Amino acid sequence: MITVAEKGSITEAAKFLFISQPSLSDAVRQVEKEAGVTIFTRCRAGVALTKEGMEFLGYARQVVQQMELLEAKYINNEPPRQRFCVSTQHYTFTTNAFVELIQKFGQERFEFILNETQTHQILEDVRNRFSDIGILYMSQENESVLTKLLEEYDLQFYELLCASPHVFLRRGHPLAQRPLLKLEDLKPYPRLSFVQGNYESAYFSEELFSTVPAEKNIKVSDRAAIVNLMIGVSGYTISSGIFPKYLQGDDIISIPLDEQETMRIGYVINRDKELSELGRIYVEALKKFR
């Protein structure tokens, strides 16, 4: 079931698993019948998970991971391999905390995943139990919509820190010497933001004040691209200012933005699941940046 979901096609999953397509189709139908839910919707392009299917797959992943741990320990006599996955918005401090987690984790066998992704995908990853924890922010602008989604997905948000907005730009930028900036100061320059796929709205934006009109907009998918565009085209982005050196560089600075808004950055987990030991270590590492 997991492979079918990952491939988005029963035919492709059958090829990957070296079994016949009819056999796999029958197996999927049998699981759906026994579970009493429709896990996949079928179409010409392949298959897609239903809402019930997403929940089913989340539990299925947990079962498979536990079986792998049992097999490694009691059959292969290997030390268990721990898995820990974080889905996060594009923050440097989440990466630094992840590095600290790995440095503190002494076992030889592990699978750690740091997934910088879109806001809605963070919620989906945690909901489907692909990720143990998700990192995102809430503000006056997005709180109502995100809170509704958290309720729908049975997730809980825990605030870690509260930050004031800062403008990130290159050290040689015409505005770099200003001690404080206003939104109107930024109008002549390209606004840089992260793409949100099918959820391009202020409610899922990683940047504050995304509804404020801008003549020049550039959207990217990763932090390295944003840094290059800040330097190459004198663009800017608005973020927390918690850790002002993107990618450990000295070319980018942050300047406080004189606007009445705050970013409440926190973590998201499933309501029915407590933080694991690795989760607690990671959260403690995040708290150091408050």
Feature roles, as predicted:
Residues 30-51:
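A short LG(V/I)-centered, amphipathic sequence patch enriched
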Residues 34-35, 56-78, 85, 93, ...:
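Alpha-helical linker/hinge and terminal dimerization helices associated
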